[in-house]
Amino acid sequence: MITTDQTVLEQPGTAPSSKIGALATRVRTVNRADASAASAFTLVALFVLQGQWRNLGSGYLYNSGQDQAMWEWFFADAAHSVFHLENPLLSDLQNFPLGVNLMANTAMFGLSIPLAPITLLFGPTVTWAIALTLGLAGTAYAWYWLFSRTVGASRGASALGGALCGFAPGMISHANGHPNFVVLFLLPVIVALVVSIANTGPTVRKTVALGLVVALQIMLGEEPLLIFAIAFGIFAVVYYIGAPRRLWPAVKNSWKSLPLAAVLALVLVAFPLYWQFFGPQSYSFLEHGAMGNDAKALTQFPTQSIGGVFTPGQNVRINATEENAYFGWPLLVLGLVAAVWLWRVASARAAAATAVAVGVVSLGSVLIIGKSDTEFELPWEWIADKPLVESVLETRFALAAVPALALLLVLATDKAFKNGLRPIPAAWSIALALALVPLLPTPLQTVERTPTPQFFSSGEWKNYVDDGSVVTVPLPRPEDARPLGWQIDAGMGFPLAGGYFVGPSDTVEKKAKYGAVDRPTALLLGSVRNSGTVPDITQQQQADARADLEFWGADVVVLQPGRSTVALRSTVDRLLGFGAEYHDGVWIWDVR
């Protein structure tokens, strides 16, 4: 039974039914199935994010590090730009006075701009929670829709595949702090449109729709789109190698429409892309070093799952938000079984090849097993410095293996339950349970965030800020971005020196770095916070402090009591030549 092969990249036509009543019944059944799938996916997403939803006022996803603070700031700044009719692509509310190129910072304008009213009314934490919930549930439903329509699989098998795509270990991991890698529901839509054009021919409607969807995905996340495009390209090549008779009809149907859709997408996002690469505070490339998966990451269970709780493996993850693989060995074994079982099906072969290819790429330049370097070079070594992929984290290519594995399971599940042999459905159901139950996600850990000092939340800061900036001690940076939240709670009413973003580290090569270009005073204050000791302040350091405050356009310097407070306060006193005053929970130096 290999008829499912004909529905993946060659969707068959269906004759209209002459029985209106039967058709209406079928539509109602389909709608109920779709509604049930959407409801189930939404409930699972709410379960995963329950801690955040229960505490929208002060809850913070523990494993996000400083990323949640950064993303909430992105949402708040977009809403501020919309409300004040300002250019959302650049903001000087961080990194004053140079500002931040937000198009070069994955600010997700495709989401942050439409949700600006919600951000303005309820705050960026609500927008953050909506984005993650919508991302998980929407991505699961979009893949379910694709599998049930384009592949032609049963609703049950399609729901299984959609759930795997929407709640895969990598999705749950990124839900801690990377909504741009969670809101992926447009990717299956792109697949559906491309497949429809290739199979049934182009129309103006399809071409325009594809261009619009690609443009919107660019404004949601370019890196996931690039990874997806590479993986889909691998799938298509392998598929047509196995089904060469379908290649020429697909080429004839697509050769005009796909380029036109690409041109339309580029025209729509031409200015934002120009701003990203050539606008103020743009950068040439972001060097991230070796970021490949340890081979054990492919076979172990994810930390935030039932399997990870009861059978944790060696800690080989990059960080809590980058568990991009962690498929678990049972799922890999089941995927292999499905690939062998369906080997005569061209789409199954293509899915298997795609999963293997992107899985190998995700391992990086050198094979690492259990943190041991084997010195065995892998394909990423040869492509890591090529244009477009040079700034991609190679570990994230593992995310593209998920839809491929899901397709294998969808096709195999559909075949198992249509086979007619009674032992097969039962055996396959047991195998699915063994592979997928350990991957069931656990709720993301949520903690209380440190309250915003009353100095900012009460509006007292207005008595100390004219047209200049607020300099916090230490300055906001990737290691501690809490001042971004203070700024949000103050209504985005003042700019901050420093910040957490990606910007150029120099004006020549424009190599990117996280955070602001380090000025002498910022480095000094960071060092004092870490050491807890007061250095001997020199005249040069005092001169540097005056120059830095002038560069930052500082009106007030603010220190919240915490780690190394005494040392930091004494250091700033000596740098400025006068003491601080304590007011509304903070130490302040008025430097106007």
Sequence positions of predicted segments:
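Membrane-embedded helix bundles of polyisoprenyl
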Residues: 41, 132-150, 155-241, 258-269, ...
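Membrane-interface coil-to-helix junctions
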Residues: 44-139, 168-184, 295-315, 369-381
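Membrane-helix boundary/interfacial segments in multi-pass membrane proteins
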Residues: 61, 174-181, 294, 315-319, ...
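Hydrophobic, aromatic-rich transmembrane alpha-helices
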Residues: 237, 327-362, 414-415
